[in-house]
Amino acid sequence: MNKGIEAQEILQIRQDFPLFRNDPVIYLDNSATTQKPDAVLNAVSEFYGHDNANPFRGIYDLSEQATERYEAARETVSKFIHAERPSEIVFTRNASESLNLAANCLAELLLQPGDEVIVTIVEHHSNFLPWLQAAKRHGAALKFLECDAKGEIPLEALEEAITDRTRLVTMTQMSNVFGREYDVKAAAALCHSKGDIVVIADGSQSVPHIKVDVQDLGVDFLAFSGHKMLA
């Protein structure tokens, strides 16, 4: 690609963001949160200015329109990650809340004293602390998968860690520190072949940057954040 054209395209893209139009800053913290383009800001402003109402609770026009928009957004997200049906999509404030919700709910259903939860050493705190707390509450063991010198998590290490007391495995699909992609699909297949093990994937870094097909991935739960992908 011609570097001059590429540079011009970048300049044009920057014009979609109020921050970048008014400031020459080079923003490199997109793994934490992304800046918002005009299209997103205008859509939010338009809704609150002209269409604001609570969804799912009113029989007047504004409320019914809000419900339709809410469900349309759910369907859009469902198609984006190729979920089997829109009802599989649960809106929360962010991936951290999603993972906390999963930990609190699943621990009540799955964990007994002596059971095991497996996490990797490369997890964001949002996919580590909730499981640590859940394991303590229920008398379960939290087991860590170490990475090798290249930052990889060998599938063999996961297979060795799984026992007949393993109830849940949770891991990131892409590290927020290394940027490395992890083979969650293979991990999910391995876990499910070993028994009724629930598999959770943190897709906070992967969903914004690579194509994610949740049905092909084979995990039981996938968490990600809209605010990390311009929304």
Show the residue positions of the predicted features:
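Pyridoxal 5′-phosphate
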Residues: 1-231
